[in-house]
Amino acid sequence: RSTRVRSSAASDVYKRQNVQYAQSALLMDMASGRVLYSKNLDERVYPASTTKIMTAILALEMGNMDDTVTATYDALKSITLEDSHMGILTGDELTLDQLVKGMLVYSANDAANVIAIHIAGSLDAFVDLMNQKAQELGMTGTHFVNPCGSHDDNHYTTARDLAILSKYAMKNDQFREIVKMPIYKIPATNKYASE
């Protein structure tokens, strides 16, 4: 169900949410594509965890959600305790469905990396797919260097490009269902019992 926002309502959002302090912003009616408010649409910004939208879309489009995926050392070696994570360990077996849900609901960097290697064989190969998809979608101000959004000066996007990606992602039924989930409990794995 789409909610339409009047222009005056967009102005109210601007005032209430202190959007004026954002480096860049875009408020868009997703159904029509009409821009209700924008600020520095094409200014380069760091996407952080919104990167995971692209990772999820590639997993949903290229993967089989029933696949059992084994977490590898290569997928997990760059994840730190300070990162958002699910606590995946080398050798953990989860389905691709569990990984995508965990990545989107918990913003789990470890899940993003495990997904990337499962889909493309390596993090670098997956990043190539991310950049190809960005170009296909017309995201001309975007360049990815990792699947989880870890900061890197060469990992960037724009508010306009994030709107393009978000609008595309919301057309995917599975993606839409996952991002509506307020919480996701991962069932028992080969290494962890379910609580």
Give residue ranges: language-model regions.
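Extracytoplasmic
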Residues: 163-195
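Active-site-adjacent loops and short helices of periplasmic peptidoglycan-processing enzymes
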Residues: 11-160, 164-173
